[in-house]
């Protein structure tokens, strides 16, 4: 029986960086950190 493969996109926004990952099941395929100034998102209301 063939194992199912799942692709998962994760996005973790933070105050000084945003982390992005693509996983196939539990294995990371792509991981990237994008750094930005905290004030970029200062005007966003929660």
From Swiss-Prot:
Keywords attached to this Swiss-Prot or TrEMBL record, sorted alphabetically, are:
ATP-binding, Cytoplasm, Kinase, Nucleotide-binding, Transferase
Q: Do you know which Gene3D superfamilies this protein is assigned to?
A: 3.30.420.40
This entry carries the following GO cellular component terms, namely: cytoplasm
Q: Which reactions does this protein catalyse?
A: butanoate + ATP = butanoyl phosphate + ADP
Coiled-coil-forming residues are none
Query: What is the E.C. number?
Result: 2.7.2.7
Q: Which domain of life is it from?
A: Bacteria
Where in or outside the cell it occurs: the entry states: Cytoplasm
The record's listing under InterPro entries reads: Aliphatic_acid_kinase_CS (IPR023865), ATPase_NBD (IPR043129)
Question: What is the top EC class of this enzyme, as a single word?
Answer: transferase
Q: Which GO terms describe its molecular function?
A: ATP binding; butyrate kinase activity
Give the protein family. Belongs to the acetokinase family.
This protein's name: Probable butyrate kinase
Source organism of this protein record: Geobacillus stearothermophilus (Bacillus stearothermophilus)
């Amino acid at each position: 029986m063939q194992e199912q493969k799942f692709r998962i996109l994760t996005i973790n926004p933070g105050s000084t960086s945003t982390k992005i990952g693509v996983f196939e099941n539990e294995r990371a395929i792509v991981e990237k950190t994008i750094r930005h100034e905290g004030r970029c998102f200062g005007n966003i209301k929660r």
